[in-house]
Amino acid sequence: MVYVNAKNYFCDSIINNTDRVLSALIKYHGLSIIAVFLLAIGLFHVALKVVSYVAVLLDVFVLPPTNYLPYGSQRGAWAVVTGASDGIGKEYARQLGLRGFNVFLISRTESKLRELAQEIAEKSKVETKFLAIDVSTDSPQNYKDIETVLETIPSVSILINNVGLSHSIPTPFLETPPAELHNIIAINNLATLKITQLIAPKIVESVKEARATKKFQKGLILTMGSFGGLLPTPLLATYSGSKAFLQHWSNALAVELAPEHVDVELVVSYLVTSAMSKVRKTSALIPNPKQFVTATLSSVGRAGGAQEKFATSTPYWSHALLHWWIAQTVGVFSKLVAGFNYKMHVDIRKRALKKQARQAAGGVADPKNTTAAREGYATESLKNETLKH
């Protein structure tokens, strides 16, 4: 609230000072009303850009980390994490455990979930539960199993919608296998919506009970977005559309649940290192899962680079600056950006096809192009080398 008030005060000061300057120009320099009006528009536009950029810097580099006590940290509340067995999802689970939340892990591979649950319980001294399901099947039994576990959990305050799947390689929409289309939508959209529809009522109920006893104050739903949803991404059209859908759905849900004291945010990410991506080396633009999740959980409630959107955050510093620059210059829906994305993914596709051909000639199967890899329950962080968006 203090941050919002300071930002509003800064805007008001610019407007008031601009008004005085323009009045002086008319009175002492004889500028016409039209000239002054056009100048005012230009100054106001520049002022908004300055305020927006300052807000990014404050969000990313200056403001203190988010306080999780209002969300039930160290007060018996549970966090649910989907896609929790690897990458970003695994790191969300670890860091929420360290913040004092009991953790319910949902993913596909039971052995990985069991190992992670044991690790979190030992290191963070919290309770853990896990459930192995394959959401690509969209089986009603999956959701019955989730409900069964939820019945054993007294209080849920956080949901991390991290599960996600993309194309095996950049592919024209007309050449995309129907099974791949189905799996992307089933995992990214249907599973996310159905799991949220199961868990959000539990969060609302838990928050009401906690507020009555002054145990904690609010709930939180974070959904993983992507630059692929922020920017139209040719050759990854279905994935791009699925993430764009999550943007609007999450924003609408944020308005619906605000009266229930549940914060809802979409988290926008660029590429993050992972085992499947084979991008093992971090850089200024490519963090590892720990770096990305630390930035995300430290800045809940702040827009970062997503200053043009509400209930949306681009938290990692380099992603934030890139997002802000694109949005404030050419625009996320510009033909220039779409054309650049298209050329980039055409090149990535060519290299991926050449690699597949070399492996086929050598009798080596590409593990990222197997049915399991394409149709598996992958976390958002498990993007292959084609997802440079």
From Swiss-Prot:
Keyword flag Phosphoprotein: no
GO biological process: fatty acid elongation
Reaction catalysed by this enzyme: a very-long-chain (3R)-3-hydroxyacyl-CoA + NADP(+) = a very-long-chain 3-oxoacyl-CoA + NADPH + H(+)
Keyword annotations of the record: Endoplasmic reticulum, Fatty acid biosynthesis, Fatty acid metabolism, Lipid biosynthesis, Lipid metabolism, Membrane, NADP, Oxidoreductase, Transmembrane, Transmembrane helix
Region listing for Disordered, in residue ranges: 359-389
Top EC class, one word: oxidoreductase
EC number annotated for this UniProt entry: 1.1.1.330
Function comment: Component of the microsomal membrane bound fatty acid elongation system, which produces the 26-carbon very long-chain fatty acids (VLCFA) from palmitate. Catalyzes the reduction of the 3-ketoacyl-CoA intermediate that is formed in each cycle of fatty acid elongation. VLCFAs serve as precursors for ceramide and sphingolipids.
Pfam families: adh_short (PF00106)
One function term, GO molecular function aspect: very-long-chain 3-oxoacyl-CoA reductase activity
Gene Ontology cellular-component terms listed: endoplasmic reticulum; endoplasmic reticulum membrane
Protein name: Very-long-chain 3-oxoacyl-CoA reductase
Broad class of the protein's primary localization: endoplasmic reticulum
Family of this protein: Belongs to the short-chain dehydrogenases/reductases (SDR) family.
Subcellular location: Endoplasmic reticulum membrane
UniProt xrefs under PANTHER family: HYDROXYSTEROID DEHYDROGENASE-LIKE PROTEIN 1, VERY-LONG-CHAIN 3-OXOOACYL-COA REDUCTASE
Pathway: Lipid metabolism; fatty acid biosynthesis
Active site: 239 (proton donor), 243 (lowers pka of active site tyr)
Residues holding NADP(+): 80, 134, 162, 239, 243, 272, 274
Segments traversing the membrane: 34-54
Membrane topology summary: Single-pass membrane protein
